[in-house]
Swiss-Prot record:
It comes from the Bacteria. GO terms for molecular function: L-glutamate N-acetyltransferase activity; N-acetyltransferase activity; protein homodimerization activity. Keywords: Acyltransferase, Amino-acid biosynthesis, Arginine biosynthesis, Transferase. Pathway: Amino-acid biosynthesis; L-arginine biosynthesis; N(2)-acetyl-L-ornithine from L-glutamate: step 1/4. It holds the Pfam family Acetyltransf_1. It comes from Mycobacterium tuberculosis (strain ATCC 25618 / H37Rv). Its EC number is 2.3.1.1. One of its GO terms (cellular component) is cytoplasm. GO terms for biological process: arginine biosynthetic process via ornithine; L-arginine biosynthetic process; protein homotetramerization. InterPro entries: Acyl_CoA_acyltransferase (IPR016181), GNAT_dom (IPR000182), NSI-like (IPR045039). This is Amino-acid acetyltransferase.
Length: 174
């Protein structure tokens, strides 16, 4: 008798508050290298933006995460994509980004931005490198009112320059 191969694709679902400690652990794995450190309160405040991946063979263990943050009426940002290092190469990051892009489409966003070191990864999803900040002067001025550090990074404000050195700015038109 031949055993059917198991479907080992990750299950990607909305994050719950109970997932925040696992998200924090994933982020901490990459903090200071390719992701900014995030404290627990910041993650709890943004939990509604996060999606997590569970691997079916690991009894619901969170093995990846990512968030979609709306920046403006037509523009979102994918941020904080992280995969358990033991699980890289299994399509988990791609599954998360695919889900986040679907959410962006559902929200009727027209463009999605990412600030990343992982240019090849995001290029496989159709992102292209850009220069500057792809918003009008009026929108730029309004966005400067945000307290979100990620928005400041998107705007390339001088006080966040140390956070973004070496990152590439990429954009996908949906």
């Amino acid at each position: 008798m031949t055993e059917r191969p198991r479907d080992c694709r990750p299950v990607v679902r909305r994050a719950r508050t109970s997932d925040v400690p696992a998200i924090k652990q994933l982020v901490d794995t990459y903090a200071g290298k390719i992701l900014l450190e995030k404290n627990l309160v910041t993650l709890y405040e943004a939990v509604q933006e996060f999606w997590v991946a569970e691997h079916p063979d690991l009894y619901g263990k969170v093995v990846g995460c990512g968030a979609l943050h709306v920046l403006w009426s037509d523009l979102g940002e994918i941020r904080t994509v992280a995969v358990d290092p033991a699980m890289t190469g299994h399509g988990i990051g791609h599954a998360i980004v695919d889900r986040l892009l679907q959410v962006a489409r559902d929200l009727q966003l027209q463009r999605v931005f990412v600030l990343t070191f992982e240019t090849e990864f995001f290029a496989r999803h159709g992102f292209t490198e850009i220069e500057g900040t792809p918003v009008t002067a009026e929108v730029f001025d309004e966005m400067c009112r945000s307290y979100d550090i990620g928005v400041a990074e998107f705007l390339d404000l001088s006080y966040v320059k140390p956070n973004i050195l070496g990152n590439s700015r990429m954009l996908l038109v949906l």
